[in-house]
């Protein structure tokens, strides 16, 4: 609360004025830090995005391909071209990406490729840092709206968050995020949900240890091949004939 300084003597006025200026400085500093945080968040993956843009200038990606976008589960999928040899795939995964980052960079990562289908894998990092299932869904809706403004009929698939044993303590929130997203997708045209959860569990409902690398968070090749098996029926007709 700011005191009324008009009825005070000179020393009191000086103290009152100092208190006011100090409070004002704190407010300005807090706002400045908030602005800096916003800028840092926006630029956190700038180098990653610029690297993709430079690679695309040097070797333009195929148009009308299936585009993968999202976090490290796609970024680390280095064998995707071998695992899906009958499809043209463009991979735009970035390590540690969240759904909000995908919204922020959609016009640079996604739209220039003019894909025929988009498959997302995001949400796990969101949950890991404490975002709610509702926030993940809200950001997913924002991504869909941003893309559909330019590509109105494009199919967009949300690859459900996986039950990695290294983050099994987050399983209830991950499952809830999958549930609310899947329920929303069921009400919308040209949105698909890739449900990986149950296939990655043992018969007694625990995460399968054979599908992960040493960190128990990211899939190994067997984990990616399982993903291919589940995804393939959603991909449509192959665009390449295998010899």
Model segments located where?
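Extracellular glycan-modifying ectodomains
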Residues: 59-61, 108, 125, 138-150, ...
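N-terminal secretory targeting modules
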Residues: 1-67, 74, 78, 82-83, ...
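N-terminal cationic-hydrophobic initiation segments that often serve targeting/anchoring roles
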Residues: 81, 110, 148, 185-186, ...
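Catalytic His-Asp segment of secreted/periplasmic serine-dependent ester chemistry enzymes
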Residues: 163-243
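A short helix->loop->beta-strand "cap" motif at the edges of active sites that frequently abuts
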Residues: 151-155
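Charged helix-capping and loop-helix junction motifs
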Residues: 133-143, 173-178
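Oxyanion-hole/transition-state-stabilizing segment in secreted/luminal serine hydrolases
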Residues: 74-90, 99-137, 157, 161-165
């Amino acid at each position: 609360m700011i005191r009324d300084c008009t009825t005070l003597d000179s020393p009191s006025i000086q103290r009152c004025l100092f208190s006011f200026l100090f409070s004002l400085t704190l407010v300005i500093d807090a706002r400045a830090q908030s602005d800096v945080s916003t800028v840092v968040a926006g630029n956190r993956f700038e180098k990653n995005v610029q690297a993709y843009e430079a690679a695309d200038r040097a070797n333009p990606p195929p148009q009308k391909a299936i585009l993968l976008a999202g976090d490290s589960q796609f970024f680390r999928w280095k064998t995707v071209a071998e695992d899906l040899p009958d499809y043209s795939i463009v991979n735009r995964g970035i390590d540690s990406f969240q759904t909000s980052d995908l919204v922020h960079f959609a016009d640079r990562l996604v739209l220039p490729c003019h894909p025929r289908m988009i498959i997302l894998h995001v949400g796990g990092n969101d949950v890991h840092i404490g975002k709610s299932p509702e926030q993940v869904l809200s950001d997913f809706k924002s991504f869909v709206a941003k893309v559909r403004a330019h590509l109105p009929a494009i199919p967009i698939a949300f690859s459900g968050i996986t039950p990695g044993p290294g983050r099994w303590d987050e399983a209830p929130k991950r499952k809830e995020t999958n549930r609310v997203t899947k329920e929303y997708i069921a009400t919308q045209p040209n949105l698909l949900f890739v449900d990986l959860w149950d296939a990655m569990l043992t018969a007694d409902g625990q995460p399968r240890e054979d599908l992960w690398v040493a960190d128990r968070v990211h899939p190994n090749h067997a984990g990616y091949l399982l993903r291919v098996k589940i995804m393939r029926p959603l991909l449509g007709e192959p665009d390449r004939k295998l010899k």
